[in-house]
């Protein structure tokens, strides 16, 4: 099976909160697209399960967020890879589009 998703057409921005699009969900992995307006964020959180995630910045500028107030600059092409049990989040400094992959899916 092959599937094409035009992320920029399927998921727009929302002035009130981040927007979320489930791109793909299977027994093997999940892909999500999050769009943030400047100043919006996905608060730091973690999942008490085994697995890994990646967050790829497609467009815009922001910060990857971690435990104890850690911040890592995030721009186009930057990728965060982490165990899913590690605290993680993201904050937008400009309009920001990210693609998140989770394996196995939660």
Summary of predicted features, one role per range:
Residues 1-32, 43:
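A short, N-terminal "cap"/entry segment at the start of jelly-roll beta-barrel domains
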Residues 21-24, 43-48, 66, 91-92:
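Short histidine-centered beta-strand/loop micro-motifs
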Residues 32-48:
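Conserved short histidine dyad/triad with adjacent acidic residue
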Residues 41-43, 80, 84-89:
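Histidine-centered metal-chelating micro-motifs
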Residues 50-63, 67:
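Glycine- and acidic-residue-biased ligand/ion/polar-headgroup-sensing regions
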Residues 58-59, 75-76, 94:
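A cytosolic small-molecule/anion-sensing beta-strand core signal
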Residues 68-85:
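Short acidic-glycine-tyrosine-enriched beta hairpin
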Residues 84-106:
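Ligand-binding loop in jelly-roll beta-barrel domains
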């Amino acid at each position: 099976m092959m599937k094409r998703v035009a992320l920029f057409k399927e998921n727009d921005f929302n002035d009130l909160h981040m927007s979320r699009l489930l791109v793909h969900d299977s027994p093997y992995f999940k892909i999500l697209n999050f769009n943030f307006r400047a100043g919006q964020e996905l608060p730091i959180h973690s999942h008490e399960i085994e697995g890994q995630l990646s967050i790829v910045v497609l467009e815009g500028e922001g910060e990857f967020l971690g435990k104890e107030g850690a911040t890592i600059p995030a721009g186009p092409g930057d990728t965060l890879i982490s165990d899913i049990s590690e605290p993680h989040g993201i904050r937008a400094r400009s309009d920001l589009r990210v693609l998140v992959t989770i394996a196995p899916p939660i």
